[in-house]
From Swiss-Prot:
Enzyme class: hydrolase
HAMAP family documented for this protein: HslV
Annotated organism of origin: Syntrophobacter fumaroxidans (strain DSM 10017 / MPOB)
Activity regulation comment: Allosterically activated by HslU binding.
Identification of the protein by name: ATP-dependent protease subunit HslV
UniProt: Na(+) binding residues: 164, 167, 170
GO CC terms: HslUV protease complex; proteasome core complex
């Protein structure tokens, strides 16, 4: 199977006018081998008020999901505060610093990328993407949101299809979550 590095994915979040859609593909790759086609990389949390998605190591991502969920409970669903506090923990905790995952978290007000270095990045335009197909999905979503009248769900679908047509680590077994 070659190397055992778990590769790529594509997760895309679009937040506009109080609505949010998050999409993720289903492919899991180890080295040069596809080992799963229908993984669910996006989900709802905190009473179905927050959307989250991940790229990178699945086990590491679930560790971060659990930590984020705990912070959301601690801060009563305040995504911005929970994300910042998780990032602080991520930077200070030796075990967390070794985690190899990126998270996207969004609600109707905020959208963040939480990086492996403990950064919290808030995109200027409400669009966020992580994973190997992220540049393609993000570029497509930006173009479509600026130059069409499509809904954000339609934009997410088309952007993910474009990413899947370019990125070999992204398939068309998409999962969508919406708020």
């Amino acid at each position: 199977m070659g190397e055992t590095v778990v590769h790529g994915t594509t997760v895309l979040a679009i937040k506009k006018d109080g609505k949010v859609v998050m999409a993720g593909d289903g492919q899991v790759t180890m080295g040069d081998t596809v080992v799963k086609h229908q993984a669910k990389k996006v989900r709802k949390m905190y009473h179905d008020r927050i959307l989250t998605g991940f790229s990178g190591s699945t086990a590491d991502a679930f560790t971060l999901f659990e930590r984020l969920e705990g912070k959301l409970e601690q801060y009563n669903g305040n995504l911005k505060r929970a994300a910042v506090e998780l990032a602080k923990d991520w930077r200070m905790d030796r075990a967390l610093r070794r985690l190899e995952a990126l998270l996207v978290a969004a609600d109707r007000n905020d959208c963040f990328i939480l990086s492996g270095t403990g950064d919290v990045i808030e995109p200027d335009d409400g669009l966020a993407a992580v994973g190997s197909g992220a540049p393609y999905a993000l570029a497509a979503a930006r173009a479509l949101i600026r130059h069409t009248g499509m809904s954000i769900r339609e934009i997410a679908e088309e952007a993910m299809n474009i990413a899947a047509s370019i990125c070999i680590y992204t398939n068309r077994e998409f999962t969508f979550e919406e708020l």
